Amino acid sequence: MVNMKASMFLTFAGLVLLFVVCYASESEEKEFPKEMLSSIFAVDNDFKQEERDCAGYMRECKEKLCCSGYVCSSRWKWCVLPAPWRC
């Protein structure tokens, strides 16, 4: 009877340990793609876009005025191409 209790306890402890190890490795695997993508798409200071006084196509125009050739959409508040049906 004692051997059965001990073997059940060891089995349960082994399953808990296995769960902890699997969870730890899975959480590391979830972080790996994020780290990889952030290193691939990291923006270097040399390649940053210049800050403009105006907003370009499909840029938010709440605080900035749209660049020439674009108008601020009254509905979406984005800079869009002018059209007769847009105000």
From Swiss-Prot:
The keyword Cell cycle does not apply. InterPro entries: Huwentoxin-1, Huwentoxin_CS1. This is U3-theraphotoxin-Hhn1a 5. One of its GO terms (molecular function) is ion channel inhibitor activity. Expressed by the venom gland. Residues 25-52 form a propeptide. It comes from Cyriopagopus hainanus (Chinese bird spider). One of its GO terms (cellular component) is extracellular region. Keywords: Disulfide bond, Ion channel impairing toxin, Knottin, Secreted, Signal, Toxin.
